[in-house]
Amino acid sequence: MQRRRFLQLASLAGLSVVAPVGLDGVKRLRAQEQRYDGPMWFFVHAGGGWDPTMLCDPKGVEPINRNYKADQIGRAGAIAYAPIVYNEGAYSNQTFFTKFGPRLCVINGVETMTNNHDTGTVHTWSGRLGDGNPALGALIAGVKAPSKPLGFVSAGGFDKTEGLTSVTRVDNVDVISRIAYPNRNDPNKEADLFHTPDTAARIAKFQRERLDAASAAQTLPALGAVTGRLFLSRTGSNELDLLMQYAPKQDEIRAAPDLLRQAMIAVAGYRAGISVAANLSVGGFDTHGNHDQNQANALARLLTGLDALITYADAQIANNFVVVVGSDFGRTPVYNQQNGKDHWSATSMMMLGKGIRGDRVIGATDEKQLSVGVDPATLAPLPNDRKAKKITPGVVHRALRQLAGVDQDEKARYYPVSGDDVALTLS
């Protein structure tokens, strides 16, 4: 394969890493890094602004909803849920919460302080109201495995890295296989080679030597970073070779539900020790018209996708993963003239996985669907109490950073989250 073609494919797969250091720094990172064996992180974005009253923060009263009454609200352990049925009875909130409730932590009354899509998405997934912070997946990958070629995989949502790691946007195993086996004419045929193994080894040796010489001659940081990116693009192919041992066939990926399809390469990367976090996304939640039907359609895709994702992750990587689900914001407690619901700052988040205590609800909204503050020490809701503190995305991020073991890292301290000091812990 020609070098230019190789780099084009590497770029397509997101492997032209935006390295914050030059070649020497990248080599030091590679020498220090071991196979990643912490939990795999999945951040699932419900794009457009979901309606928690149709999911995990049910109200059962007019004018907030027209779908059910208060005495119809379901319960799975400590978690109350809206009695919504999807796909003509093929799936329901009851199915989801009965199956996963014992492992699930629900956080209601999360105050995003915005009704703007971009601002809400950034706040939910960076922990800061405003620009400047990386996505949480990028931060965790940047601390735990900054030079891994698939450390942070993204299929949508907020995925800014602030240079802490690379971001990979690919769900095509065929593209990755060409990068993993650059000496094969057909990546699926082990003996179909451009060069003999000895010749390929000599070429690789000369390439490394030339890259070392080019790096030694550079004094400008920008050019040094370029050599670092080139080094990562080339040396990453060895780890991608390992990835291919775990990667599903492209036909399997195509046949999977959308949310699972987005995650399958990341799961293979995790099993190979080169993936840390993945952004996943389901759209269709911006329901300004025909809210009840359109929101239900989007929730059906989300919940069936989450079911498939969690089931697949359980089978592939046991309990060594975390799933966090959130949205831009919530929906209004009243319907508009188009039978839709508009933007509302109060929302919910859900999470399950390693280290997270399940069958638990934190926070609340009141009868008007306004976020209720909590006791900053006990987390008990304190309606109309001036001592109460609001749970914001930043408060949730503080707890997630602690769970991930990155809260004390200098990279995390450089990107502080917003919000009050609330003693939220997830374990």
Residue ranges of model-derived segments:
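Ligand-binding pockets and gating/stacking loops
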Residues: 1-427
